[in-house]
Amino acid sequence: MSRYSENIIIGAGAAGLFCAAQLGKLGKQATIFDNGKKIGRKILMSGGGFCNFTNMEITSGRYISQNKHFVKSALKRYTQWDFIALVAEYGIPYHEKELGQLFCDSGAEDIVKMLGAECDKYGVHIQLRSEVSDVEAVENNPKVRFKLKVNAVEWQCQNLIIATGGLSMPGLGASPFGYQIAEQFGLNVIPPRASLVPFTWRESDKFYSALSGVSLDVAVTNQHKTFTHQMLFTHRGLSGPAILQISNYWQPGESIHLDLLPYNNIRHHLDEMRQSSPKLQLKTVLSRLLPKKLVELWLEQGLIQDEVIANLSKVRLENLENLIHNWQFIPNGTEGYRTAEVTMGGVDTHEISSKTMEATKVKGLYFIGEVLDVVGWLGGYNFQWAWSSAAVCAMGIAES
């Protein structure tokens, strides 16, 4: 015999949990199925375990989608301030780290517990270790639009909400399930790729792996954007906030330009030093401005020569200027989904209502969160998209 829930949500991550709680709050029944052993697994890992749950400077211009204006409605109707108010209601201590980024003081578990408590409060049924299969549409029945199997048991529902996320962090249960459902029902899927992800070295740059663990502030630029933030050298390539941000705008084969001294000008600085301390060695001057290990590596590789700064030729000064302020780096690629924070691409937002997250072609089928072709900047933007898309989905169902 079939079981029934008015609203079935697949995925117990940020978007799925929040949508279920919001549905319950609006008087609607909701059931969540997830194949994992715990709810909110990705939330627990986020922000170094402290969950950067939103950003005070949310704006639609910091999201990427092939449908440029898609995010505007949801972000306006459920804002960062709405979510911050909920966090405050639960007495969760938090702080601003930088650039509007809000983190939990005690840990990401506070957010997961809050979402779990909201689901409990509003009677949401959560079933874990659940494999969903055989999703089908049911014709000519407004109360039963879909049927599916969960661990071989048939369930029916009026509304089916896909909150299965993207392909990033496969170790936490990521799968293409949401994309497969979209395609099954005739929706277009923008090819997914890893986003907010470190770059890897080409063979010619691998000597830089000796700097693994070294970080510095940089300005990183490509044809589309510039970000000024911290960069980290790793064994595999380049990481850190500046690199993760630019990865959203990078295309394979494209070069990025790195200014390793964004708050200073090496030519002006050396001109001043040649006036005041002409006998200083170049290594000494550079080691005061840049990580010493980086300067030593440049010397080892013959990219610079240690000499008295008074003797620096015009050509060597120009080469040094390019090395520091205009390092043209062509990534070999990215580290891929294993370390990517999120997935770019996904269900085509041209085929989704921006007001309700319902598929325009399929009544009762909704997509929320990362499964959609929406990706935000690093810094709480993607969590806010989860909250906002989930909230307007619940509103849309309650109003229909």
Stretches with model-predicted labels:
Residues L128-K143:
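A conserved short coil-to-beta-strand element within the FAD-binding core of flavoproteins
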Residues S5-I32, C393-A398:
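N-terminal Rossmann-like FAD-binding beta1-loop-alpha1 element of flavoenzymes
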Residues R3-S5, V150-N159, F227-T228:
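Core beta-strand elements of the Rossmann-like FAD/NAD(P) dinucleotide-binding domain
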Residues G24-G48:
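Glycine-rich FAD pyrophosphate-binding loop
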Residues L128, E296-V375:
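A glycine-rich dinucleotide-binding beta-alpha-beta segment and adjacent secondary-structure elements
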Residues K38-I39, L44-M45, T54-S60, P93, ...:
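An anion/pyrophosphate-binding glycine-rich loop and adjacent beta-alpha core
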Residues I8-I10, F33, V132, W155-G171, ...:
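Short hydrophobic core segments
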